Amino acid sequence: MKIATYNVNGIRSRLPNLLEWLEREAPDIACLQELKAADQGFPIGAINDAGYGALWAGQASWNGVAILAKGVDPVESRRGLPGDAKDTQSRYLEAMAHGVLIGCLYLPNGNPWPGPKFDYKLAWFERFLRHAQRLLDTGQPVVLAGDYNVVPTDEDIYDPKHWRRDALLQPESRDAYARLLAQGWTDALRERHPDERIYTFWDYFRQHWPRDRGLRIDHLLLAPALAGKLKDANVDRWVRDRPKASDHAPVWIELAAGAGRRSPAKKSVAKKAPAKKAPARKAVKAPAEKRSARKPAKSTPGRRLS
């Protein structure tokens, strides 16, 4: 079974690249982040035509997550993290597909640091930690996949000294990620590549992709029920080299056959609207996360302010 995560950085503008990747790599499950489209703007027709069922939580211009499943319709179990009823940002979606419980997340970026966006990042991370522990306690085969916006160690970035004031490298961000692993989750990519500098994101700024000046911020974490079934993990770098590419490349894992439990997912892959949402609430106080503009401040080379 192949499970992937891919920050598309705008699903409408990257749709050709997404469809090419789905056809060529054929993941059984794909988690998408930064859709940057309202629910009605999600290209479900094209996704269905590619052979995938989908659930999505959109948001106009910002955020947005989706779970795609090959040949089946994923069964939603949660939309949004518990713990803050006022937070309406579309950052977390959870569903069962092919016998595996998938948590798809887009963790807040947190820049500029320090400030309210970083405070929101840490608060969101704490809620995520609590929910992750509850998932572990169930003993289910769970994968938490997405853009974590955390560079776990200095080995996960081309040159940490230029990013010391970025939210992705702050001690609080790294500590939260370390506490997540301490719960019992396995960082799949690092498990398969313990000593390799392997990246998942290359900024558009200053030719970072041609120079391979990357960061590892997209992660797939495995519950103990799946950790022993990990066969391989890697990054589809070729996608980052396509015209009009996202600044992220897809990251994937391969699990041994029989890794998942019997799934209740239906084999229809029918075109459908996203699952019903709660009535609209007042705008969340949390600051919006903008990641389209990547140019750093002059005083801090390489720093993303979004």
Where are these regions (language model features)?
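N-terminal, active-site-proximal structural segment of metallo-dependent hydrolase catalytic domains
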Residues: 1-49, 63-65, 261-272, 276-306
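Active-site-proximal beta-strand elements of phosphoester/diester hydrolases
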Residues: 1-10, 99-114, 145
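Active-site beta-strand/loop signature of hydrolases that rely on acidic residues for catalysis
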Residues: 3-7, 22-40, 102, 131-154, ...
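Soluble or luminal CAZymes and related metallo-dependent hydrolases
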Residues: 10, 14, 87, 120-127, ...
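Active-site environment of divalent metal-dependent phosphoester hydrolases
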Residues: 11-13, 37-40, 113, 151-152, ...
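Metal-dependent phosphoester-hydrolase catalytic domains
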Residues: 24, 39-41, 77-84, 153-271, ...
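Structured beta-strand-rich core segments of catalytic domains in phosphoester-bond hydrolases
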Residues: 35-38, 42-112
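Surface-exposed cleft-lining segments at the edges of enzyme active sites
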Residues: 82-83, 108-125, 161-166
